[in-house]
């Protein structure tokens, strides 16, 4: 029989914190709607399974993804200390994705090129940081300034790549790239663009194309 003790403990932890999680979600959605309007979202909550346990741990006990303009999945491991503090940020990140779902073609993940993906994740992270500036995510400090420049020099020629496995390796890390390379570069790229164009509202920059965000940033492909 497979060992399900850990899974049972995670499920029990979610059930124990049910009211806390619900309140966090309600307050976070209120914060999010102050800048971007997207009502009637459905948020699905589940435990981290054995296959996802590593990445959930790397992300501080919360891993989430957007599966439509109205649907967000939260995978939680309450056994990992600090997950409560990261919960609002994770929801806000996916909320921005949900808002941009049709604009950014997020419904066709396999059709996204590397530039689409890097800018999409950077936008979502920037939005979450606007709401929760004191929260630090693992990818915020995954690369030093020198590391960001070096990794950009390696991947900038691949911006048009639609190779799903190559993109995943860059975004999350692989034998060839440090952990969270794509997320770190994406956040820094979008941050550099929007700090220089502070007059843009979240609604405006959420609807800007990846190419224009890249052009506005300090990151250059040449």
Predicted regions span which residues?
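Short pre-active-site segment immediately N-terminal to the catalytic Zn-binding motif
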Residues: 75-91
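Soluble non-cytosolic domains of exported or imported proteins
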Residues: 19-23, 85-86, 90, 114-118, ...
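Inter-helical turn/loop segments and adjacent helix faces that build the functional surface
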Residues: 82, 104-114, 133-140, 196-201
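Active-site recognition of the HExxH zinc-binding catalytic motif
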Residues: 89-103, 121, 125
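N-terminal accessory alpha/beta regions
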Residues: 1-11
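Auxiliary, metal-adjacent structural segments of Zn-dependent hydrolase domains
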Residues: 10-69
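Pan-zinc metallopeptidase signature
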Residues: 156-222
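Post-HExxH zinc-binding segment in Zn-dependent metallohydrolases
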Residues: 111-151, 220-222
């Amino acid at each position: 029989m497979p060992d399900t003790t850990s899974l049972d403990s995670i499920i029990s932890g979610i059930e124990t914190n049910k009211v806390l999680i619900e309140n966090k979600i309600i307050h976070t959605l209120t914060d999010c709607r102050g800048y971007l309007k997207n009502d009637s979202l459905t948020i699905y909550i589940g435990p981290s399974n054995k296959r996802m346990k590593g990445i959930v741990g790397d992300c501080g006990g919360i891993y989430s993804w957007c599966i439509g303009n109205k649907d967000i999945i939260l995978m939680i491991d309450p056994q990992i200390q600090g997950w409560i503090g990261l919960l609002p940020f994770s929801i806000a990140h996916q909320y921005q994705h949900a808002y941009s779902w049709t604009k950014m073609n997020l419904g066709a993940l396999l059709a996204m090129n590397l530039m689409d993906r890097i800018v999409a994740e950077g936008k979502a992270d920037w939005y979450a940081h606007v709401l929760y500036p004191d929260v630090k995510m693992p990818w915020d400090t995954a690369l030093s300034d020198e590391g960001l420049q070096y990794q950009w020099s390696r991947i900038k020629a691949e911006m048009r790549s639609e190779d799903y496995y190559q993109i995943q390796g860059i975004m999350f890390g692989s034998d060839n790239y440090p952990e969270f390379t794509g997320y770190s570069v994406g956040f820094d790229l979008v941050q550099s663009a929007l700090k220089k164009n502070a007059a843009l509202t979240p609604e405006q920059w959420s609807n800007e194309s990846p190419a224009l965000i890249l052009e506005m940033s300090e990151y250059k492909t040449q």
